[in-house]
Amino acid sequence: TSIIPDMDPTRPAKADPRKLHAAIERFGVTQLFGSPALMQVLATHGEKLATVKRVTSAGAPVPPAVVQRMLELLPPDAQLWTPYGATECLPVAVIEGRELLTLRARTETGAGTCVGRPVAGNTVRIIRISDDAIGDWDDALLVGAGQVGEITVAGPSATDSYFNRDAQTALAKIRERLADGSERIVHRMGDLGWFDGEGRLWFCGRKSQRVVVDDLTTLCTEQVEPVFNTHPLLLRSALVGVGEKGAQRPVLVYELKPGVNADVAEVSDELRHIAEGFVHTGKVKAFLHHPNPFPVDIRHNAKIGREKLAAWAAKQAIKDSE
């Protein structure tokens, strides 16, 4: 039996936690699925979820603090899963919340977000970053161990094409001939990531949202933003690039927590100090406070509209440590 709570499904971040709990208690809900934005609502509300045995959250990375708080609200034997995938291929990989929390320090120092080990049946490989179409698979596309590249997946749930969208199909699909002479389609996720030594996949952000500073420096959103999100006054942040790709200026746009009345110049200075703690974040010199809530996707309310924020940042008078 599926229970649909009293909420606007296009605005999970605005859901009333009291109504969510009312539905959970009335029907004795044991399994819960929701976007990270909905998890944030429940975590902030802070009421125990006594009947829930399994939680699944997908659509965007779940902040470590939200994972920790949700586990505190669940029964000790309950599980919290954060699967990784896309409409074109789901699921790709999965990790349980407790393992994710053991990796929190790595996420908050620039490793990216661990999305777990590939699901059985999937062949997940990392290829060199390119915005061009790739017609046929070649092992020469693969990056070295531990290097960041584009995540690709071949498996039973990967789609072969987009309906009546030949250009998009060419950019997202690679034809691979197997040793037995058969062929399969490899899907390019459009995400950047890498594998650690234990076979776990790490998500580093969308390929289209990477910031290319120069030929030697590319910054990935999920390797930069979690470092700054450790600031106690920040609700979230977004790395954006201003200027042409290949010569972009990295800018960190940030949103303060609701109700916080802070000197944004001081906050920006504190963020600059955080940036200086790591080589990759040291490239970020400009910080902009966004006075309104970030633009987000209508479905999950968790995917940040970085393209819109980049356009907004480009219109601001940017200076170092603004």
Where in the sequence are the language-model features?
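Short acidic/polar active-site loop segments enriched in Thr and Asp
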Residues: T1, T30, K53, L235, ...
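Conserved AMP-binding/adenylation subdomain of ANL enzymes
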Residues: T1-Q31
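Generic structural signal for well-ordered beta-strand positions
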Residues: I3, V143, D196, W202, ...
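Conserved AMP-binding/adenylate-forming
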Residues: A22-E25, G34, K53, V62, ...
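AMP-binding/adenylate-forming catalytic core of the ANL superfamily
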Residues: A22-E25, L32-F33, G155, D160-S161, ...
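Conserved C-terminal "lid"/linker of ANL adenylate-forming enzymes
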Residues: A238-G243, V251-L252, H273-E322
